[in-house]
């Protein structure tokens, strides 16, 4: 008889647990998964005699929040996965006035790399952010005669920051592509 009472007690506990679990799930109270959310700040640059930029930093911020974020979630979430490895991007700060350069932005070689290295601290100084080690920066540039639409320095899979230069483009595809380089992804032969 005691054995039967224990079995009934255990069945009641299991039924109660299942009922609570179903209640949580049906009300949308499922456990949250870890999302690797990264911040992208946006600035514009210009120089004397530069043409007008096709878009602006606010448009690029919208593109990041809507299209780039959705693309990266798609790229990094595996079917059946709990989402713990999903990478998400959101816009942080947007500089309201372009940074005026003393000369036209360089497109290739050492001067182009030097520009990428020097614009980052200046942009963050103007944005009022002193620790930008875990932030990405998108720099929107007017047409400078470059053959590329976007450029980024190669990072590593553990990188949590990087700089992307957009050459008169606000393309979500180009931004998402360049962010891939900041993760250490190169080009493939496919």
Question: Which residue ranges define each predicted feature?
Answer:
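N-terminal secretory signal peptides that target proteins for export/translocation
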Residues: 1-11
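Sec-dependent N-terminal signal peptides
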Residues: 13-21
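C-terminal segment of classical bacterial N-terminal signal peptides
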Residues: 22-31
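Walker B catalytic acidic pair
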Residues: 178
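N-terminal secretory signal sequences
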Residues: 2-4, 17, 30-34, 39
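Propeptide-to-catalytic entry region of secreted or membrane-anchored zinc metalloproteases
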Residues: 32-175, 183-190
């Amino acid at each position: 008889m005691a054995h039967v009472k224990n079995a009934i007690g255990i069945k009641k506990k299991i039924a109660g647990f299942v009922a609570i679990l179903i209640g949580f799930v049906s009300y949308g109270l499922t456990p949250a998964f870890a999302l690797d959310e990264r911040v992208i700040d946006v600035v514009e640059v210009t120089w004397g005699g530069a043409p007008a930029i096709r878009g602006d930093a606010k448009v690029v911020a919208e593109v990041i929040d809507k299209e780039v974020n959705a693309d990266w979630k798609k790229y990094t979430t595996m079917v059946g996965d709990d989402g713990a490895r999903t990478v998400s991007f959101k816009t942080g700060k947007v500089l309201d006035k372009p940074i005026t350069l003393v000369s036209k932005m360089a497109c290739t070689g050492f001067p182009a790399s030097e520009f990428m290295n020097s614009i980052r601290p200046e942009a963050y100084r103007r944005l009022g952010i002193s620790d930008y080690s875990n932030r990405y920066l998108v720099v929107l540039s007017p047409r400078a005669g470059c053959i590329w639409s976007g450029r980024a320095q190669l990072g590593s899979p553990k990188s949590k920051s990087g700089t992307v230069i957009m050459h008169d483009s606000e393309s979500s595809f180009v931004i998402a592509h360049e962010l891939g380089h900041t993760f250490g992804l190169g080009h493939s032969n496919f």
